[in-house]
Amino acid sequence: MALTMSAKSVSARAQVSSKAQAAPAVAVSGRTSSRVMPAPALAARSSVARTPLVVCAATATAPSPSLADKFKPNAIARVPATQQKQTAIITGASSGLGLNAAKALAATGEWHVVMACRDFLKAEQAAKKVGMPAGSYSILHLDLSSLESVRQFVQNFKASGRRLDALVCNAAVYLPTAKEPRFTADGFELSVGTNHLGHFLLTNLLLDDLKNAPNKQPRCIIVGSITGNTNTLAGNVPPKANLGDLSGLAAGVPAANPMMDGQEFNGAKAYKDSKVACMMTVRQMHQRFHDATGITFASLYPGCIAETGLFREHVPLFKTLFPPFQKYITKGYVSEEEAGRRLAAVISDPKLNKSGAYWSWSSTTGSFDNQVSEEVADDSKASKLWDISAKLVGLSA
């Protein structure tokens, strides 16, 4: 069911992966980080082989003994199939929406959460801080800004023998004040490369695992954003999302052409565009795979999490004024904990098991299947997006 690796693309990227240190297979007591290339560090690339001058590599530094003793990361472990609970992979589960969704699922006692994160120690500290029970979660390294890391994650997960009942694509980067683009290990603009392309590869490589879910109700959830929905007031705040003719993406969103529409770089728009791409991907997956696999594909906007770490790179004045504005003016404010419960419901609630849905919430009616923007609903453009994305990540139909 998963798309197959393009031999030409694999060969082109082999030079990169052979130089980069492989991601750790199990958790270690250390802090893992990734280096992101600035534009000047990029070498010239073609649309087929884009080998960056600097390779993103995982590095680890040992924490102090006291921290290592206190926070021992829970590596994913083999458990007999008959003893396994329902399993959900959540990307970006070390903070914010992802962490609180993991907490809500773990609290049911019916789910095991695989926290797919870049930093083992941060994830372990976060899980302990919110009180996730021991044995209810494990941590597996994933850096979505590296396609090699995505493939290594999938290999490690499959080797664990874990079942997969839900895949939640939540992790995202948002660089609203960036004046110059940043790039992934594979040479893609960072927001598009991480938020869209990294998740695109991850979902395709795990489709067969989801299809074979023992609970017979597998779900693939990709988090969207109201800022990418031009049907809303928030979605019409400039710069508005617009993928244009996808010429920038077709070129690989490189240093010379870093926006999906081929226009001048704008950090806030790059994030919005990536979320439009995520929502279009959900619709494509629903149309291509739902009937044959039974997998439920859905996206959601859980509400305005005005105090999320996603805004860490915004200007201080915005971070001060935005939460009260959402609480008292728009009334759209939602806490990280409540947003996490909503995401957990989309993962597990039988009433929200609708493929192709874009879930939103209102204060009066609760959850509802919302209308997507005209661009997200453009299936012809979405099909083109799919084909380009598959080529960029090394997959073929």
Curated annotation (Swiss-Prot):
The stretch annotated as transit peptide is 1-57
Its UniProt entry gives the catalysed reaction(s) as: chlorophyllide a + NADP(+) = protochlorophyllide a + NADPH + H(+)
Which family does this protein fall into?
Answer: Belongs to the short-chain dehydrogenases/reductases (SDR) family. POR subfamily.
Q: What does this protein do?
A: Phototransformation of protochlorophyllide (Pchlide) to chlorophyllide (Chlide).
Name of the molecule in the record: Protochlorophyllide reductase, chloroplastic
Compartment(s) = Plastid, Chloroplast
Give the first-level EC class, as a single word.
oxidoreductase
Q: List the disulfide bonds.
A: none
Give the molecular function GO annotations.
protochlorophyllide reductase activity
Q: What is its EC number?
A: 1.3.1.33
A single GO BP annotation from the record?
A: photosynthesis
Name the CDD domains for this protein: LPOR_like_SDR_c_like
Q: Which GO terms describe its cellular component?
A: chloroplast
PANTHER family associated with the record: PROTOCHLOROPHYLLIDE REDUCTASE A, CHLOROPLASTIC, PROTOCHLOROPHYLLIDE REDUCTASE C, CHLOROPLASTIC
Q: Which organism is it from?
A: Chlamydomonas reinhardtii (Chlamydomonas smithii)
The entry's keywords: Chlorophyll biosynthesis, Chloroplast, NADP, Oxidoreductase, Photosynthesis, Plastid, Transit peptide
Pathway(s) served? Porphyrin-containing compound metabolism; chlorophyll biosynthesis
Coiled-coil zones: none
The domain of life is Eukaryota
